[in-house]
C-alpha cells in the first residue's frame, strides 16, 4: 500500500471530508494552547496539519517532532476556521486534522532556517541538500526540467533524432583548456572531456542522420564567472541541407515555443538581426542588452585634430576609438555619482571618464559644464552636440583609448546607468524580453602574442562565400556564417554554418598556421569524412543553464543547477576535487610534481 495518497501542496477543497495520507518534512511546528500545528512540506508545497490532544499517542509524537523531521500523517481534510485562511497557499483554505503521525526519520538541528534569504553561497553549497529543499530551488529545478521537456518536444516534432556522443574523446587544444582523463590501459595517453560535441555532430551529418540533437554535458577548464561552470549543459543541434537563414528561423521558433509553454511569455514574432560591426559600434558589445535605451556615438574622426591629447591620440591610433554616451536628464547626476562611475570604468581598463553637462545648448560652449570644454575647438563641440542629439539637462560621457577598452568600459557604463535606479526612474531601461540575432562575425581574431590568427568561434565555421578568397590573401577580412542568439544582454545560443568541403577546411587550418601534418594528427578523422560527400550543414547550441537562469530571475546559474561548482571550480558538498590514493596514480603511470613555492 502506498505511504501517501496526496501531495501536501495539492490538498485543497476538492478533498474536503476525505481522509488522506501525506508524507513530507516539518517546515514549522507551533504549540498554540495545547493544540499543535505542523506545516508539512513536500515538493508541491505546504499544508497545515492540526494535532489535537484528544488522540494521546499521536499528540505525544507531535510534541517530539522538530523542523525537518520526515513524517507521515493520516487525517481528515476540513475547512480552516473563519479568519484563519491563508491566501498565499494553494492549500490555504483547508487543514488536515491528524489521526495518525509516524516519524519516518528524525533530523538533527539544521545549520540554517530554510526561509532565511540572507545565507552566504558558501553555506548554501556546503549544505546543498538542505538548500535544495527551499521552495525557490525546487521551483528552479522543476522549471529546468520543463524547459528540457519542451525543447525535446519541439525538436522531436521537427524530425530531430536524439543521439549520444562520446564523453571520452580526443584533446584538440584550440581555445579553452580541456579537462584531461588519463588512460590506464594506454599508458601515457589521455582522453579529454568534450568542450562540445562539435566534431561528432558534424560527422553525424556526414553519416546521413540529417537532424541531430542532444541535451548534454560539456566541460571547459577555464576561469569562472557568474554565468560559467566547468561543466555545463547544452541543447546541442545540427541539421543538413539548410542555409543560415533557415537554421536561424528553425531555432528562433524553438526558443519562442519554450518561452511560451514554460513561462507563458510571448517573444517577438520575428527577432531583429544585427551585424556584429553594428552591435560593436552602437553598444560596444556583441551581446547587447536592447532593454537599455542608450547608445554610443562615434566621435573618432571628429577628434583627430583637437588639442586635447586624451582624445586626439587614440583618435589617430590604428586601433583607437573615441566614443560618447549621452544620458538624457543626466545633468541631475552629482559629482559623487560621476566619481563613482569614473572608478567603475577603471575596472575595464579605462584611465578615466570625461564628461560634459549640457545646461543650455543654445549658448554653445558657454552653456556647457565640464573641465574638458576648454580643450576642444568649436567644430568638435558642434560635432559632439549634433551627433549625440544632446538636449538641455543631459550629460555626455566619453571614452577614448584602444577600441577594446572603449567598448568594454563604455559598454559596461551603459548597462550600469541603464539598470540603475536613476535609469529606471528616467525610462532608460525597458521591461520585458529583447531578443536578437547577431550575425556576420569576424572569422578570425589576431593574436599579437602568438603573431597569428585564431578562430573567433571555432575552426570549423564556414566563411561567407564571397570571402573565401581572403582565406589565403587577407584572413582578417573574412566574415563567418556565424550567428549568436542574444537575449537581454546574454548570449543564450551560438552556432554557424559549417565547412563541408575538405579543401576549404584545409585552407582555414593553413590560415590558422596549422600545418598539414598537425591538421592530420588532430583532425584527420574530420578531413577524411569531408571527402565522402559531406552535405552542407550547420547548427547551434543553446546554454540550458543560462536560459533557465534568466527565466527564473536567478542571480547565477548556480541557482539552477542541482550540484554546481564554485567560482574556484570546487564542489563544497563533496569536497571535490580531492587528492587520490598513490596506488591509483601508479596504475595510471602518473607522478605528481609539487607546485613551486613562491620565492620570499
From Swiss-Prot:
Looking up SUPFAM superfamilies in the UniProt record yields: Class II aaRS and biotin synthetases (SSF55681), GAD domain-like (SSF55261), Nucleic acid-binding proteins (SSF50249)
* Functional note: Aspartyl-tRNA synthetase with relaxed tRNA specificity since it is able to aspartylate not only its cognate tRNA(Asp) but also tRNA(Asn). Reaction proceeds in two steps: L-aspartate is first activated by ATP to form Asp-AMP and then transferred to the acceptor end of tRNA(Asp/Asn).
Q: Which InterPro entries match?
A: Aa-tRNA-synt_II, aa-tRNA-synth_II, aa-tRNA-synth_II/BPL/LPL, Asp-tRNA-ligase_1, Asp-tRNA-ligase_1_N, Asp/Asn-tRNA-synth_IIb, AspRS_core, GAD-like_sf
Q: Name one GO cellular component term.
A: cytoplasm
- Chief subcellular location equals cytoplasm
Q: How does it assemble?
A: Homodimer.
Q: What are the start and end residues of every segment in region (Aspartate)?
A: 198-201
Q: Which residues bind ATP?
A: 220-222, 229, 491, 543-546
Q: Where in the cell is it found?
A: Cytoplasm
EC id: 6.1.1.23
Q: Which family does it belong to?
A: Belongs to the class-II aminoacyl-tRNA synthetase family. Type 1 subfamily.
Q: What is this protein called?
A: Aspartate--tRNA(Asp/Asn) ligase
Record HAMAP family:
Asp_tRNA_synth_type1 (MF_00044)
Sorted alphabetically, which NCBIfam families does this protein's record hold? aspS_bact, PRK00476.1
- Which organism is this entry from? Burkholderia orbicola (strain MC0-3)
Q: Which gene encodes it?
A: aspS
The UniProt keywords, alphabetically, are: Aminoacyl-tRNA synthetase, ATP-binding, Cytoplasm, Ligase, Nucleotide-binding, Protein biosynthesis
GO BP terms: aspartyl-tRNA aminoacylation
Which residue positions does UniProt flag as site: Important for tRNA non-discrimination?
32, 83
Pfam family example for this protein?
GAD
> Which reaction is recorded as catalysed by this protein?
tRNA(Asx) + L-aspartate + ATP = L-aspartyl-tRNA(Asx) + AMP + diphosphate
Q: Which Gene Ontology molecular function entries are recorded, alphabetically? A: aspartate-tRNA ligase activity; aspartate-tRNA(Asn) ligase activity; ATP binding; nucleic acid binding
The positions annotated for binding L-aspartate are 174, 220, 457, 498
